[in-house]
Amino acid sequence: LTAFGCRTATFFRIAIAGFLLAAVGETVSPVRSLADSPITRENARPGGTDWILTDPADHEVEGYASATSIQRGDKLHFYIHSTDPRITVAIYRMGWYAGAGARLVQGGISLPGVRQPMPSADPVTGLIECDWQVSYTLNTATDDPGEWLSGVYLAKLTGTSSGKQSYIIFTVRDEARKA
């Protein structure tokens, strides 16, 4: 299609959609506006770009979570290995945030760096399993309905002396919230 043809087709689609909305507008039951959605309100908040890795680690700092998805209100354990003597953890919720991509929801977490043991393969099954100690426990329990909304979160790990960074990625669900 030419540019003119695409514009014409788009115009007709919009016109038909408008006609259909006008025709059935009286019979459609009222629904909650998207602006009333907790997720929409959250994504309208200001974000930042500090969540982006500026010096990705090559095993200097790395970790994993006890689960990839948790229910809002649950606790989540982080298992972190670091060659740095101290690390910081900052938790970001991914979202629109005016195009910034994420918003800091919890920062200022300073932890001692721990060199965790290198995992080895099970000789029978070949399974490689980390048997690391818990470095930090994140608690998502809150009475504030605007905190720990469902979504994808990043725990950004940063070695304080090396500046090396990596992520632990997890999801928070809210099964009590109506879709």
Q: Language-model segments: what does each one mean?
A:
Residues F4, A22-V24, D74:
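Intrinsically disordered low-complexity regions specifically enriched for long asparagine
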Residues V28-A179:
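Extended, solvent-exposed regions of the mature portions of secreted/cell-surface glycoproteins
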Residues L1-T10:
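N-terminal secretory signal peptides that target proteins for export/translocation
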Residues G5, I14-G18, S166:
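Low-complexity, intrinsically disordered regions enriched in charged/polar residues
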